[in-house]
From Swiss-Prot:
It comes from Aliivibrio fischeri (strain MJ11). One of its GO terms (molecular function) is magnesium ion binding. The lineage of its organism: Bacteria, Pseudomonadati, Pseudomonadota, Gammaproteobacteria, Vibrionales. This is Phosphoenolpyruvate carboxylase. InterPro entries: PEP_COase, PEP_COase_bac/pln-type, PEP_COase_Lys_AS, PEPCASE_His_AS, Pyrv/PenolPyrv_kinase-like_dom. The keyword Aminoacyl-tRNA synthetase does not apply.
Length: 876
């Protein structure tokens, strides 16, 4: 890397050297020499030497089976360490300004002052600030929890080594510790031997909260409070809750038969247990700190005649939390539950802790109150008694199946065969009725019983424990009403947000019409109390129509939903189902939020954070603080300095781009007769299905083709062979078409003046930079029948044409010109990803020759898949 990134370069070099020592100790000098030869050949091949590229291919082809796994692990492990060094660099004191965006909030406040935004308006926007991140297990973090814990400790060592005044012995000790951690990682199994259960995934989510967010959220709020104090003259109210967490882990049953109502109940108990456990650690720390004697009458009343009143109150809370852990333990084990008071509501913690806080301030000890006690109070608001709120997600047809079976049993016809109007009439009638609908003697099928039992589990919980009920593949108003009816029948005592997820191109285009129909129903308007959540699906719409067309459909749907809710005086929260990759809506958070339609963030931000992106954005407390800063500044900016309304000619051209790109995408994916055989042969799609990643099957329908593949394995497969097809196909072709039609000037204007369009092009540039056409060609030659080669060649030629079109519109000479750090980061990884790709192609070739794949080859293949995912940084 160039000298600009000297500190990062130094850390990468040190970690690489320590990894080399570990490899030598474990496998001998010969294997280390082999790894080093491959690395050097990869570097010179990347610099343009065809001779060295051929030598690299031959070197990898000649590896005996017993060397494949250690060589693959060497490069995979190095990429993990590089990611760690890079993540650390973004929070280190040596980080360059254009890399870190160290103080997004202060930058925003300067911008607001220059734009004459009043402090009153800013204060109001801060009061309304609402960031809800929803942790999800898919595409499933490739790295195991074991590895992640080691990487967190490696980060701590890097932090120590950065201190200027570190003593020689301390440096030596820290470097030794680093080497131990790298050796531990090397000798641990990098790949799970069995698929994680939904319970394992939920525990992974809780580990993220414990290791990072428990510290990161109060730290962010402390910094945010200081910035507000400086800019507005008033800080953040103590009870403010601008950030909170939800989760799909253990609640998302869409296409995952392993998430049952029993699992959901267990995950919710576990979530409460983990919350009580973390609060108990906080309370024990506060007991050791708050030894003060002076207090207000209110605290004296709570503490009784104890000499140390604060400790007395905290000890009461310690008992409450201890009893809570005991009770939840018994419930999870199915044992007799002790009859003791336990934590069920956050106010049980908040009220006594807040009384202590006010008392300390009143008695002149504000500096003490504003320390650990304030952090705990912030946590109580952010995490509640349940740590994370659990969403329930289910596919729309599972609800209509319940009603269909029920109506047939009742002898009133088949719900599924009714018209939409008849369904709505029936549902509204039943929702307004005071008598129960489910007959006592009815014995439904197991699938239907499971849906009913899930609704009953929801009804058992407190409202605070739950997020929203998300209906995937929502298409009609009756899909939403059906869930409300099933929850009512289950005895749900509170109003739960029922959130339709519009995810295909057609469904996005119809979303406004569906919501208008719902808002026209009196029962519905009365029930929702002027609040509506709608989820925008990014992954399936992109898989259905390509990224350009899907992006415009998402934008148009958001705009239409904002308009209809404004007209009806309904507060709208848009829930974004983004992933880590562009093919699933992934973009740098700040840019993505500022490219949304005006007013679309008025109701706050609710967004999924997926598997591996959770680690990159939230995996360390300091990194989480940076991420929250970016989210908060982007939402405030979008609401206080909204982006321009798109001009009509921009909209018209976007319609053309959308239509042309969708047609170009579908002509290949649906219209090309060789496409499916090519996809199956040129990518590890079939092998990926066997990888023990997430708890969820790779296909919605195990017998279906590409169309039944989930969006995640679809994108994951293409990113493995470096063609990354779903993330660009159709977009550049549409841009070139518009240039040919004489619209270049208009495209350039859109690029300059419209954040939505410039962000699209920026995302495309990043994808193009990650593509490696030469590598894709190597996969073709090694793995596909010669009859399929012309299709691969056509796609790669299209990619080159598309890159020229995008650079032309942006007036750039090369990709990522405006993002040198991003470009450098990808370039650094390529040297290590390329050998993994060649290894993977070789392994796929060897395993496909065998009737029964040897465990040796299967393990090596899994390591390459995990390594390439680490190198590409966003798996799916």
């Amino acid at each position: 890397m160039n000298e600009k990134y000297a500190a990062l370069k130094s850390n990468v070099s040190m970690l690489g050297h320590l990894l080399g020592n570990t490899i030598r100790d474990a496998h001998g000098e010969e294997l280390l020499a082999k790894v080093e030869t491959i690395r050097k050949l990869s570097k010179t091949a990347r610099a343009g030497s065809d001779e060295d590229r051929n030598a690299l291919i031959e070197e990898i082809k000649s590896l005996p089976d017993d060397q494949l796994t250690p060589v693959a692990r060497a490069f995979s492990q190095f990429l993990n360490l590089t990611n760690m060094a890079e993540q650390y660099h973004t929070i280190s004191r040596h980080c360059e300004a254009h890399v870190c965006e160290p103080d997004a909030i202060s930058t925003l406040f300067s911008k607001l002052s220059q734009s004459n935004v009043s402090k009153l308006d800013t204060a109001q926007a801060v009061r309304e600030l609402n960031i809800e991140l929803v942790l999800t297990a898919h595409p499933t973090e490739i790295a195991r929890r074991t590895m992640i814990n080691k990487l967190v400790k490696i980060n701590e060592c890097l932090s120590k080594l950065e201190l200027g005044d570190i003593s020689f012995s301390e440096r030596d000790k820290t470097e030794r510790r680093l080497e131990q951690l790298i050796a531990q990682a090397w000798h641990s199994d990098v790949i799970r031997q069995e698929r994680p259960t939904p319970l394992d995934e939920a525990k992974w989510g809780f580990a993220v909260v414990e290791n990072s967010l428990w510290q990161g959220i109060p730290e962010f709020l402390r910094e945010f409070d200081q910035r507000l104090e400086g800019h507005l003259g008033e800080g953040l109210p103590i009870d403010a809750r601008p950030v909170h967490m939800s989760s799909w882990m253990g609640g998302d049953r869409d296409g995952n038969p392993f998430v049952t109502h029993k699992i959901t109940r267990e995950v919710m108990l576990l979530s409460r247990w983990k919350a009580a456990d973390l609060y108990l650690k906080d309370i024990n720390e506060l007991i050791s700190e708050l030894s003060m004697v002076k207090c207000t009458d209110e605290v004296r009343e709570l503490a009784g005649d104890q000499h140390e009143p604060y400790r007395a109150i905290l000890k009461q809370l310690r008992t409450l939390l201890g009893d809570t852990l005991e009770s939840l333990d018994a419930q999870m084990k199915g044992e007799l539950v002790p009859n003791k008071a336990i934590l069920t509501d956050a106010d049980q913690l908040w009220n006594p802790l807040y009384a202590c806080y006010q008392s300390l301030h009143a008695c002149g000890m504000g500096i003490i109150a504003d320390g650990s006690l304030l952090d705990t109070l912030r946590r109580v608001k952010a995490f509640g008694a349940h740590l994370v709120r659990l969403d329930i997600r289910q596919e729309s047809t599972r609800h209509s199946d319940v009603l269909s079976e029920l109506t047939r049993y009742l002898g009133i016809g088949d719900y599924d065969q009714w018209s939409e109007q008849d369904k709505i009439s029936f549902l509204v009638n039943e929702l307004s009725s005071k008598r129960p609908l489910l007959p006592r003697k009815w014995e439904p099928s197991p699938e239907v019983q499971e849906v009913i039992d899930t609704c009953r589990v929801v009804a058992e919980q407190s409202k605070e424990a739950l997020g929203s009920y998300v209906i995937s593949m929502a298409r009609t108003a009756s899909d939403v009403l059906a869930v409300h009816l099933l929850l009512q029948e289950a005895g749900c005592p509170f109003r739960m947000d029922v959130c339709p997820l519009f995810e295909t191109l057609d469904d996005l285009n119809r979303s406004k019409e569906v919501m208008e129909q719902l808002f026209s129903i009196d029962w519905y308007r009365g029930f929702i109390q002027n609040h509506q959540m709608v989820m925008i699906g990014y992954s399936d719409s992109a898989k259905d129509a390509g990224v350009m067309s899907a992006g415009w459909a998402q934008y148009s749907a958001m705009e239409a939903l904002v308009e209809v809710c404004e007209k009806e005086s309904i507060e709208l929260t848009l829930f974004h189902g983004r992933g880590g990759t562009i093919g699933r809506g992934g973009a740098p958070a700040h840019a993505a939020l500022l490219s949304q339609p005006p007013k679309s963030l008025k109701g706050g931000l609710r967004v999924t954070e997926q598997g591996e992106m959770i680690r990159f954005k939230l995996g360390l407390p300091e990194v989480a603080v940076n991420s929250f800063n970016l989210y908060a500044s982007a939402i405030l900016e979008a609401n206080l300095l909204p982006p321009p309304e798109p001009k009509q000619e921009w909209r018209d051209l976007m319609e053309v781009l959308s239509e042309v790109s969708c047609e170009a995408y579908r002509n290949v994916v649906r219209g090309e007769k060789d496409f499916v055989p090519y996809f199956r042969a040129a990518t590890p799609e079939l092998e990926l299905g066997k990888l023990p990643l997430g708890s969820r099957p790779a296909k919605r329908n195990p017998n279906g083709g590409v169309e039944s593949l989930r969006a995640i394995p679809w994108i994951f497969s293409w990113s493995q062979n470096r063609l990354v097809l779903p993330a660009w196909l159709g977009a550049g072709e549409a841009i070139q078409y518009s240039i040919d039609k004489g619209h270049q000037e208009l495209l350039e204007e859109m690029c300059r003046e419209w954040p939505f369009f410039s962000t699209r092009l920026g995302m495309l540039e990043m994808v193009y930079t990650k593509c490696n056409p030469q590598m894709s060609e190597y996969y073709d030659q090694r793995l596909t029948d010669k009859s399929l080669w012309p299709l691969g060649e056509r796609l790669r030629n299209q990619l080159q044409t598309d890159i020229k079109a995008v650079l032309n519109v942006e007036n750039n000479d090369h990709l990522m010109e405006r993002d040198p750090w991003g470009s450098e980061s990808i370039r650094l990884r390529n040297i290590y990803v390329d050998p993994l790709n060649m290894l993977q192609a070789e392994l796929l070739f060897r395993t496909r020759q065998q009737e029964e794949t040897s465990p040796e080859l299967e393990e090596a293949l899994m390591v390459t898949i995990a390594g390439i995912a680490a190198g590409m940084r966003n798996t799916g």
